Amino acid sequence: PVMLVANHVSWLDVYSLITVCPSRFVAKSEIRGWPFLGWLSRNVGTLFIERKKITDIVRINQDISNALTTGDLVAIFPEGTTSDGTTVKKFHASLLQSAVAVEATIYPVAIRYHDTSGELSKAPVYVNVSLLESIGQILQQPWIEVELIFADPVNSSGKNRQELARTTQQIITNTLSPQMSPHKEPEKPSCLPVE
């Protein structure tokens, strides 16, 4: 079983990842009702979570475990929300319980966006704006490049979810650190496992 764990900058993250690695995503249930994006999400097998119901975590972890054991690639954003792309927020460990339960291999994925000059682009950032405002910001740009950096896999066997949250958060934070030059040519996933 394989799980992708990524930082979360924009609603574009899902569509960027899915073009490289067809995956099932975990998303807040509200997205189901969004125009167009809700329809897209439903049609790619998204697993929806009722975030206001604490007890829904048990159900969603079972759904993720089932998906993983049947061979589906599942992707999660453990920050639970989007950031401005300059920092990685604290990873919540709850959704990583499914990886522990099935001893999944976890691939940390660092996501960032660049503008035409190669600098970090703020246009895709989905923080304190409506979906329409976000789309408008993106459409005003002449060009945006998404960079998906797949780090070395993390074996979940023998680890707990908190340990996995800390480890994957640190890996992604280090990968996105300013010292690392943008446009580094990452290895292309042929959609993963080469263990």
Segments from the language model and where they lie:
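Catalytic-site beta-strand/loop segments enriched in glycine and acidic/polar residues
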Residues: A67-L96
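A membrane-cytosol interface segment of integral membrane proteins
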Residues: L47-L68
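Generic beta-sheet signal
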Residues: K28, I49, F77, V109-I111
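A cross-family acyltransferase "interaction/gating" segment
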Residues: F36-W39, T86-E163, T167, P182-E185, ...
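Membrane-anchoring hydrophobic helices of lipid-metabolizing enzymes
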Residues: P1-V2, K188
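C-terminal alpha-helix
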Residues: Q170-Q179
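Catalytic core of membrane glycerolipid acyltransferases/transacylases, capturing the structured
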Residues: V2-I54
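A conditional alpha-helix N-cap/helix-loop micro-motif detector
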Residues: E30, I54-I57, V88, N128
